[in-house]
Structure formats: C-alpha cells, structure tokens
C-alpha cells in the first residue's frame, strides 16, 4: 500500500508497566506509563461480519450525544466508541480485578460492567465483570448512574474502590454498569471507560481519576500525554502509551507547541482554519476543535465535511467516505491551523484500506459529526491526528501541546 495504513483485524491484550522507565528518569514517583494495544473498532467488527450498517438506523452515524445522571441533564458530550481503536488496562479492588478500558479525554467518569448485570444483557456475558464481593476494599454507594448514548443507554450505580492505573493506586468512585445494549458493546474489545476529562464533564460531579491521582502528589507535573504508534499493524507492535506526569521524548521530536484551552472544563482549543493543499477551505473565520483520545477519526460538521470531501473527490458510502485506492497517494495534504502553526496530514495519514473491503476502494479517516451546543459545533481531532502529533494535556496551565511523533 506504498506506506499507507492497513487497518488491523486482530484484538490484542494489553501490556501495562506502571513503573517502566526506559529513557525516563529513574525516580518512579515522577512518571508512570500505561502501554496500550490497538484493536478493531466496533464499526469494523460489524462490517467484517457483513452487517448492513444502513439497517441499524441513522443514530449509528451520530457518535455523540448528551449524557444524564438520574433526572439531571448534563451538557457534556461523550463518544459512543463505535470507532475507538486503542485500549489499556486497569485493576479495580483488592486484589485487583483486571479490565480493558478506553482512556477518553472526551469524558470524565470511570465505568466497567458489574457482576450484577443480568445475563439477559448479552454484552455483559462477553465482558469481564466487576464483583464487589471479591474485593476487601469495596465501599457501597448506590447512586444511580445513566449514560445516554446515541446507540443506547448504559446504566448502573456508583461504587467506591481502589483502582490501580499505571502502577498508581487511588481510591475512586466509579460506575458499575448493570444494563448494556448488545449493540454496539457486545462487539467491543474493551470492557469499560476511564474518563480523562475535567470534573465539569463528570456525570454526578464525581471527582475524575486524574484529579485524585494529582491529589497524591506522586507525579512530577500535572500533565498526561498520549502516543499512538503509527506502525502498529502487527500483534507484536506496541499500539501506544500514556505517560502520567510528563511526556516521553523517545516518541516525539523537537519542542511542544502549546495552545490554550477555550475554557477550563473541556479539552477544546481554537482553530483558525483548515487547508486543502495550499488553500484555506474551511474555518476561515475561526472555529473550535476537541482533542479526543476516545475517537479514532477526525470529524467536523456535516456541512464542513461535505465541502472537504468534494474537494478531495471522495464519495459517501453509508457512513464513510471512500476513494479509489490507486488515487489515494495523489490526494492533497490537509492542514489544521492551530496556535499560529499548521499541522499537516498527508494522504498516507488519512487514507487506509480496510482489511475486509475491496482492494479497489479505500476509506478516509474523516467523518461528519454534528455536536450540539454548548460544546459544538466543533471539529474533533482523534487518533488520526494524534498518531502524527504526540499530544500533551496540561492540567496546570489549561493547555494542549503538540510535537511531531516518531
């Protein structure tokens, strides 16, 4: 494929070394690493099984929706993880019960399936379940928790226990999910979610896990960073890593360029334009961009993406945009204007051939997604962008930094 990415079919287990320090200071209280693995997304799994996505209804093309806790509605937005490709591992309880989770900057709550989930929910049958009776450190809370997705509702109740993440143990309130829709979660490689957002995004105002880690004073800096391997197409390859308390210079070059957040409470920054080739095509008057580790693709409003796809000559196929594979290498660069710099993706970064599809058509890792106010309308920069640019989330200074990944 002349260097451009082929999407993997395999599911992988995580290797997590909380105290691994290759290339980092030997003080284990300074940095903590979480190693990630790459997996097929739920959407890929559905397509591989021959599921007609059009029959699932239009809600499957809307990856975002408002959330609610009990009778209160939050303006927070959370992905439905249809296209999520990276997961890591945490332990909950004493002794730790291990779960594969998505680390998501677009949300702030932690949740995993509960042993109290009825076997009538097929998704629970296919996932690891937290059993409070097996944990000596468990504390009951019981507050009802409901996460409303565009593809269904995940609900349960809050509990408290010790969570181990990256070698750090922290007492954390989390959701035990007792109701999960079969689709999409039955096909998910991950069990649950660890939100890396702010308390303003947290359903029920539950203190996010990173805030609780910071309160222990075990990290050198109030930051965490994400690296997604651009060459993780085989089972032996590291999918990526998260560094708590800093960044890993082994995986980026040069210095970070920082952009201040629009406001405290959401990982969202201003954007000054989107260029195709040498011409600014979109966002000429300025717009917003979420930096979302829970999403695989880059997304923008339907009107923006339709204009972008017209410029690229791409055609819509159900919920994707495709081009002829032999045309992929000739597609122009796409640049995102952030903080006075242009962050450029070549066609090798945003065009891929799906392993289950015809070799004649290739998919663009760019989707339309209409996010309502107050967070939207906004672009979202997911793994397609983060694979190219190592990303640091700076809580102390309310900013996001980018450096060229390698």
From Swiss-Prot:
Leader sequence segment: 1-23
The subcellular location is: Secreted; Membrane
Q: Which GO terms describe its molecular function?
A: aspartic-type endopeptidase activity
Recite the UniProt keywords alphabetically: Aspartyl protease, Cleavage on pair of basic residues, Disulfide bond, Glycoprotein, Hydrolase, Membrane, Protease, Secreted, Signal, Zymogen
Q: Which organism is it from?
A: Macaca mulatta (Rhesus macaque)
Domain named Peptidase A1: residues: 86-403
Q: What name does UniProt use for this protein?
A: Renin
Q: Does the keyword Transferase apply?
A: no
Classify the source by domain of life: Eukaryota
InterPro entries reported for this sequence = Aspartic_peptidase_A1 (IPR001461), Aspartic_peptidase_AS (IPR001969), Aspartic_peptidase_N (IPR012848), PEPTIDASE_A1 (IPR033121), Peptidase_aspartic_dom_sf (IPR021109), Renin-like_dom (IPR034135)
What would be the name of the gene that encodes this protein? REN
Q: Name one GO cellular component term.
A: membrane
């Amino acid at each position: 494929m002349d260097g451009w990415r082929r999407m993997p079919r395999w599911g992988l287990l995580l290797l997590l070394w909380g105290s691994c320090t290759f290339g980092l200071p030997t003080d284990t209280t300074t940095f903590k690493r979480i190693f990630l693995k790459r997996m097929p997304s739920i959407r890929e799994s559905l397509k591989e099984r021959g599921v007609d996505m059009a029959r699932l209804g239009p809600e499957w093309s809307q990856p975002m929706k408002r959330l609610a806790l009990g009778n209160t509605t939050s303006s927070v937005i959370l992905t439905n993880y249809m296209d999520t490709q990276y997961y890591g591992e945490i332990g909950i309880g004493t002794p730790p019960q291990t779960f594969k989770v998505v680390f998501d900057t677009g949300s702030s709550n932690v949740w995993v399936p509960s042993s109290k989930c009825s076997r009538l929910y097929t998704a629970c049958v296919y996932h690891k379940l937290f059993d409070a009776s097996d944990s000596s450190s468990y504390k009951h809370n019981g507050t009802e928790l409901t996460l409303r997705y565009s593809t269904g509702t995940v609900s349960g109740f809050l509990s408290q226990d010790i969570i181990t993440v990256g070698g750090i143990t922290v007492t954390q309130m989390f959701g035990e999910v007792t109701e999960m829709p079969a689709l999409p979660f039955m096909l998910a490689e991950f069990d649950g979610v660890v939100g890396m957002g702010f308390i303003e995004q947290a359903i029920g105002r539950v203190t996010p896990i990173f805030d609780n880690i910071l309160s222990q004073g075990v990290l050198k800096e109030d930051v965490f960073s994400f690296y997604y391997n651009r060459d993780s197409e085989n089972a032996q390859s590291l999918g990526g890593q998260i560094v708590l308390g800093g960044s890993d210079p082994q995986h980026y070059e040069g210095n970070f360029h920082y952009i201040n957040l629009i406001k405290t409470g959401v990982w969202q920054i201003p954007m000054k334009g989107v260029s195709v080739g040498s011409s600014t095509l979109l966002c000429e008057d300025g717009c917003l961009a979420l930096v979302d580790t829970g999403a695989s693709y880059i997304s923008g409003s339907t009107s923006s993406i339709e204009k972008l796809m017209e410029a690229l000559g791409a055609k819509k196929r159900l919920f994707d945009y495709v081009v002829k594979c032999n045309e992929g290498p000739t597609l122009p660069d796409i640049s995102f204007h952030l903080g006075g710099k242009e962050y450029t993706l070549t066609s090798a970064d945003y065009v891929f051939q799906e392993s289950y599809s015809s070799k004649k058509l290739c998919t663009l890792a760019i989707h339309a997604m209409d996010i309502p106010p107050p967070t939207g309308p906004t672009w979202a920069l997911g793994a397609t962008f983060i694979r190219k640019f190592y990303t640091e989330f700076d809580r102390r200074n309310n900013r996001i930094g980018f450096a060229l990944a390698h």
